[in-house]
Amino acid sequence: MPHTVLYVPVPGLEPYIRWRHEEEGPEWLSPDPGHIHAHVTLLGPFAPQSDLTPELVADLTALFAAAPAFDFVLEEIRVFPSGLVHLHPEPAWGFAELTAALTARYPAYPPYAGEFAPVPHLSLCALGPGRDVELVHDELRHLLPVRARAQHVHLVRYEPHGTRVLRTYPLGTGPVLSEARASTS
């Protein structure tokens, strides 16, 4: 079923993530060759595409404009109890703050539909026959660490054979929320 997700793209890991999608879920590959599949999710699933009104788009624009861009590093490979192998961003606070702000603003869309805690991460692959953590370490040895900057957020529609970016929101282009509050007091 089609759904939307808000995420921070991580171009430095795109070759690996694209390859993993080709192996584990090719139907989710975007037909757009410039699409960045490697990402850290902020909120998903998000609003159905039919609910993306001009007011909602404007609200997201303002929310992200008030959030500062930030640097992060992806180096530490971890595994969730479900067997999902992922990279943990350091520092994680920027992702956690954005997710908390989105969750507070849009309580009808809890992170991961309320099934999992909103732990910032970049999904790599699932453990399974012939795929263990040591193999993932070996595959990523030449790519890690990845130093990146969260500068914008993509609103992406996921649909089999039709995944695409609907909108891109820059971070930090407006007054930061705490600065805006200070200037009005």
Language model region names:
Residues 1-71, 92-151, 164-185:
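Basic, often amphipathic N-terminal segments
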Residues 86-87, 124, 155:
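Short hydrophobic/aromatic-rich beta-strand segments that constitute the beta-sheet cores
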Residues 89, 158, 171:
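Active-site donor-binding loop signature of nucleotide-sugar glycosyltransferases
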Residues 75-82, 120, 153-164:
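Short proline/glycine- and acidic-rich turn/helix-capping motifs at secondary-structure junctions
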Residues 83-84, 98:
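Short, conserved acidic/polar surface loops in the N-terminal third of protein domains
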